[in-house]
Amino acid sequence: MWLEWLVAWSWSLDGLRDCIATGIQSVRDCDGTAVITVACLLILFVWYCYHVGREQPRPHVSVNSLLQGVDANGLQNGSMYCQSPECARCTHHEGLNQKLYHNLQEYAKRYSWSGMGRIHKGIREQGRYLSSQPSIQKPEVFFLPDLPTTPYFSRDAQKHDVELLERNFQAILCEFETLYKAFSNCSLPQGWKVNSTPSGEWFTFDFVSQGVCVPRNCRKCPRTYRLLGSLRTCIGNNVFGNACISVLSPGTVITEHYGPTNIRIRCHLGLKTPNGCELVVGGEPQCWAEGRCLLFDDSFLHTAFHEGSAEDGPRVVFMVDLWHPNVAAAERQALDFIFAPGR
């Protein structure tokens, strides 16, 4: 009798319920064979529920999507907190952690787990790290544990690259001035982007945006582009890497915000630094200087403003993201793989 039930079973949840009900009725009639049937069906029912639960679709969260929704609101480079409920940078943290762990496992299979302890720990406990961080430092996407934290870094943190940038100050400035002449012909020349600010104007000219080179812009500034290739610690192969010229017009205030990660140092080389301009990181103010690099951790709450007059002209810096000096070479390689553009 129980074999006939299995043959006729429609392999659905409703079929299971009907069979179990029939089996229970048989038990009441003291049918010994039905007891075995009910037991088998209960086991199959448990298996069915487990199987259905495993196959529930999970939202796919690519690493790149973390920084995409911001652009739709007129922002770029993860520069400001996004209020959009659809922005993957601000939601779906569980799906993100699963994706990051999958990327780490794939990297370890290809190469090695050696030196991956801190990254593994960071991914495994990402939610706790981000929620427990003090409000003065709160990276929005990825926090690597056990890195020394400070709002500003000394020039010696990445001495080679700082000195190389400062030696090439005049070359970068010259290429910027050529670019900036185009502003007299139209409101926004090709290659420039406008960033959202509560007051004033903030423009950027990207060479590398979220780990992706912008060829058209690089061709307009060949010496600056070659210089980027000479930097030893430039982040160029993952979504946390950016390089651009950043221009603040007089009267501009950038809203306080956090960067996406603590694995990088943001470097500003001053090109034009009139009076009344200031950078505030973690509550500590600093001023730019022409021809000098200013290094800071943008995972700290930070802002910038230009309180000068129109006669002072814009504040201009060359911005590039460098590796945090305490991220080991093996970790850099793995993070480039995990956070590769398009992954």
UniProtKB/Swiss-Prot annotation:
Keywords: Dioxygenase, Glycoprotein, Iron, Membrane, Metal-binding, Oxidoreductase, Signal-anchor, Transmembrane, Transmembrane helix. Glycans are attached at residues 77, 185. The chain crosses the membrane at residues 32-52. The keyword Glycoprotein applies. Signal peptide: none annotated. It is found in: Membrane. Pfam families: Asp_Arg_Hydrox (PF05118). Residues 1-31 are cytoplasmic. Gene3D superfamilies: B-lactam Antibiotic, Isopenicillin N Synthase, Chain. GO terms for molecular function: dioxygenase activity; metal ion binding. It is a single-pass type II membrane protein. Residues 53-343 are lumenal. InterPro entries: Asp/Arg/Pro-Hydrxlase (IPR007803), Asp/Asn_beta-hydroxylase (IPR051821), IPNS-like_sf (IPR027443). Fe cation binds at residues 257, 302. Belongs to the aspartyl/asparaginyl beta-hydroxylase family. This is Aspartate beta-hydroxylase domain-containing protein 2. It comes from Mus musculus (Mouse). The gene is Asphd2.
